[in-house]
Amino acid sequence: YPWLKAHVEEAHRHGLKVLKHCCGHTWPIIHQLAEVYDAYEAIQETAGMDIGKLKPVVGDKTCLWGGIWHEHIIDGTPETIREDARYAFEKAAPGGGYIMGSTHSLAVGAKPENILEMKRCRDEWGTYPIDPTKFV
């Protein structure tokens, strides 16, 4: 990964931040990703990448972006979206370095009511400094 690090360092020299979109099971390389990139996006729970377990391991080195299962955006309900958001905010937001988003993307078939619930959760819980008492 030294060549990746060199590319990111060049971007940093120009004042840029670099996000890594990386699907799948990345535990074997999570420390390298956190060392190189400013943000890690697409934290895919279905591949064993639990945002609540990632935060204490690399949350002080990189921004974590995700938490709302993209499968739930397609097949779930506003209630499942709210559960995903509550878990992500509780586990990843305290101390900063968290951006709420889908675990992948807003795929074809995403339900508008679930996207709107993401926005409601963001509006309700997503302003720093995070207040953990809001999640109950």
Q: Which residue stretches match the model-derived regions?
A:
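Active-site loop segments of alpha/beta catalytic cores
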Residues: 1-136
